[in-house]
Amino acid sequence: MATKVITGKVRASFVHIFEPQSVNGSEPKYSCSFIIPKSDTETIGKIKAAIEEAKQNGVSKWGGKTPANLKLPLRDGDIERPDDPAYADAFFVNANSREKPGVVDRRRIPITDPLMVYSGCYVRASVTFYPFNTNGNRGIACGLQNVQLWCDGEPLNGRVRAEDEFDALDDVDDEDFLD
């Protein structure tokens, strides 16, 4: 049993929502990291409640009790990524899925262009939290369901859009260009 949460405005990072990606030879999955400002207490509260519910649902998978070394999906960017300013004063969750997530714009029109949703843009996300017990690893996983583009943001890869980097040029006569 999974518990669903729809986030508020979060920042997308490591966006792989249009094509699945394999990590270290594992099964290819769709994935995205969602950076949640610590000031968004509503989204953080919903995620914490969903994790607690998933823990209760997982007791049967974990031999009747919650393990002490349980892996949890809500992580603190200040602790785990102290050198990355995008994660400062924020929590994050890494969500993934074997199935392609739905991706829509603000008006719920499907987005198929992978350049529209990128690491650094702002989105809302539909994610689920569920218990797992695989190969001795126990914890709560975060499943990727759907993504809604909220607005553009500064790309996290450091790349600048061409239209932001260059000034418009006047029309040039080809003969003048060669001089």
Go through the PLM ranges and name each one.
Residues M1-F92:
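OB-fold ssDNA-binding interfaces and closely related basic DNA-contact patches used
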Residues M1-K4, E154-D179:
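Acidic, gly/ser/pro-rich intrinsically disordered tails
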Residues I36-K38, F129-P131, C151:
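Beta-strand elements of well-folded, non-transmembrane domains
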Residues K46-K55, G102-P110, P114-V117:
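Extended Gly/Ser/Thr-rich low-complexity repeat segments
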Residues R107-V123, Y130-I140:
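Exposed beta-sheet edge/beta-hairpin loop segments within beta-rich domains
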Residues N135-E154:
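OB-fold/S1-family single-stranded nucleic acid-binding modules
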